[in-house]
């Protein structure tokens, strides 16, 4: 692996020892993530008052019932959208404090649409394989829900919000943390640290197990490789957001221990230990997901190394 232009152009603006700067980067990333989530939760109150007033004012009939119905159906939208606060914190830090370009987070125009498409396809294949193994082996089963137009539109509308949520986590752990550590050290170390923090941040989720944290870390390593090889944030934004969306709102899994409301399929868990079924954490807690991620890692690593060899040969010929 070699550092791309994105990492090479980063101004770290520090003479701190590597250990101190690494610990600072970990602290700041954690602070922005947890702080952003806290701000988002604190804004629920004022937000609900404003929306509640509008719903009551414009809705005929029982206003209270309308407010309750509104939040029952649409709170997930707000919950996912609140991640924009974390995104803005990192953007402010990069532009105002670091005085780096937003491209140092991976926001580059080159091939952005193609990378979004590839990220979506990767997650569809990964989750498709996991669901197929569940269904065929009896680990779990999927039945198509009978849905009216309203819940279908609700589900379809969630996709860009999952992209925002998953993309923000990628900006935090890959776009910012990985690149800043890599700028002062090396890529394997930066990938290991950012992926480990990614796993640790999920340890408070419902149904968490050792295997579920391991899978989150493996997914972080995979995202790190995809991020480095593309030198862009867009593929991992799409891969992460689609991964969560397909799990929760298409297949009916828990998403890292959290329910995702309406789904196209209804998932029924079969008998078996949590390490096989995933338990309350969802598919991310299953050994099946571990195997899929390991295979994905091998494929991406080999493709990435081949791409770098081709690039090096072209440079030599030039």
Place the predicted regions along the sequence by residue:
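Functionally important transmembrane alpha-helices
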Residues: 35, 212-274
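Membrane-interface helix/loop boundary segments of multi-pass membrane proteins
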Residues: 12, 168-193, 225-232
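Hydrophobic alpha-helical membrane-insertion segments
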Residues: 25-42, 81-82, 118-126, 233-253
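Hydrophobic alpha-helical transmembrane segments
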Residues: 68-85, 160-168, 273-294
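Small-polar-interrupted transmembrane alpha-helices in polytopic inner-membrane proteins
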Residues: 130, 162, 186-203, 216-217
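Membrane-interface helix caps and helix-loop-helix hairpins in membrane proteins
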Residues: 140-145, 201-210
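Juxtamembrane helix-loop-helix connectors linking adjacent transmembrane helices
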Residues: 36-75, 79, 98-168, 178-183, ...
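C-terminal membrane module of polytopic membrane proteins
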Residues: 245-318
């Amino acid at each position: 692996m070699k550092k791309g232009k994105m990492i090479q152009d980063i101004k770290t603006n520090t003479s701190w020892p590597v250990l101190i700067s690494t610990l600072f980067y970990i602290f700041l990333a954690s602070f922005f993530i947890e702080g952003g989530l806290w701000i988002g939760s604190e804004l629920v109150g004022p937000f609900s008052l404003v929306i509640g007033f509008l719903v009551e004012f414009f809705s005929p009939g029982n206003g209270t019932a309308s407010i309750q119905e509104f939040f029952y159906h649409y709170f997930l939208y707000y919950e996912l959208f609140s991640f924009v606060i974390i995104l803005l914190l990192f953007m402010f830090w990069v532009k105002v404090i670091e005085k780096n370009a937003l491209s140092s987070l991976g926001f580059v125009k080159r091939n952005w649409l193609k990378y979004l498409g590839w990220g979506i396809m990767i997650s569809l294949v990964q989750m498709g394989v996991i669901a197929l193994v569940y269904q065929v082996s009896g680990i779990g089963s999927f039945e198509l829900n009978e849905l009216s137009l309203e819940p279908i539109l609700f589900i379809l509308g969630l996709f860009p919000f999952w992209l925002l949520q998953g993309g923000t986590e990628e900006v935090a752990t890959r776009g910012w943390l990985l690149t800043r550590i890599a700028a002062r050290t090396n890529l394997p170390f930066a990938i290991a640290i950012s992926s480990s923090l990614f796993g640790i941040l999920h340890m408070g989720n419902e149904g968490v197990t050792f295997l579920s944290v391991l899978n989150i870390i493996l997914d972080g390593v995979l995202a790190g490789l995809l991020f480095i090889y593309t030198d862009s944030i867009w593929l991992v934004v799409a891969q992460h957001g689609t991964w969560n969306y397909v799990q929760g709102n298409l297949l009916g899994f828990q998403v890292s221990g959290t329910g995702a409301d309406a789904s196209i399929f209804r998932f029924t868990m079969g008998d078996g230990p949590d390490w096989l079924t995933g338990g309350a954490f969802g598919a991310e807690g299953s050994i099946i997901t571990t195997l899929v991620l390991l295979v994905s890692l091998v494929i991406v690593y080999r493709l990435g190394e081949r791409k770098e060899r081709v690039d090096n040969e072209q440079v030599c010929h030039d």
